[in-house]
Amino acid sequence: MTPPRIDFAQLTAFDVHVHLEHQGALTETEKAAVQHFKSGSAPRDWPSQAEYYRSRRIGCVVFTVEETLTGRPHATNDQVAQFAAEHRDIAIAFCSINPHRGRAGVEDAKRLVASGAVRGLKLHPPVQEFFPNDRVAYPLYEVFAEAKLPVPMPLWPVWKSTGSFASAKTSYSG
């Protein structure tokens, strides 16, 4: 996989939190979030997202959130890596692997890291239903620690389609 080639001196900013969403129709949860956060004008299709950032000279870390437990549609890690490869002047790919995937998730992480396709692991404890100190996540931490790659994770509540933040998963939010 082609590594990023970002000329940071040419950038005006760098966004470290850019979701690449699935390319199908919005789910009810997504519609409610767009309305709540007033983000309806933000580009959702990937070519437009790339152009949005490039035209403003903003670099970005792109990722998805693997939600295998919720069933919510999401982009795949390979799609995120491909996006970053196609837009290597502005994008750096992080993968997202649910720690509950176990050995299969660890093997996927090793493959993505070895290929050079990703430069970090984005976890989301409230959505993926684990505590940051849960041993279920240790094997993934080890893959990325060995590669000297970061593992950022938010610890805030999760937006739900009910028009509020979820209370059921706030226990994972620190």
Residue ranges of each PLM-predicted region?
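An N-terminally biased module of ancient metal coordination in phosphate/nucleic-acid-related enzymes
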Residues: 1-72, 78
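Short, flexible, glycine/charge-rich loop motifs used to bind or transfer phosphoryl groups or to couple energy/partner
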Residues: 2-4, 50-51, 83-84, 111, ...
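A residue-identity detector for tryptophan
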Residues: 8, 46, 156-159, 163, ...
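Histidine/acidic-residue-rich catalytic or RNA/ligand-binding cores of hydrolases
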Residues: 24-30, 162-172
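Active-site gating/metal-coordination segments in enzymes
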Residues: 59, 67-167
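Non-catalytic alpha-helical scaffold/packing segments enriched in small hydrophobic residues
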Residues: 139, 171-174
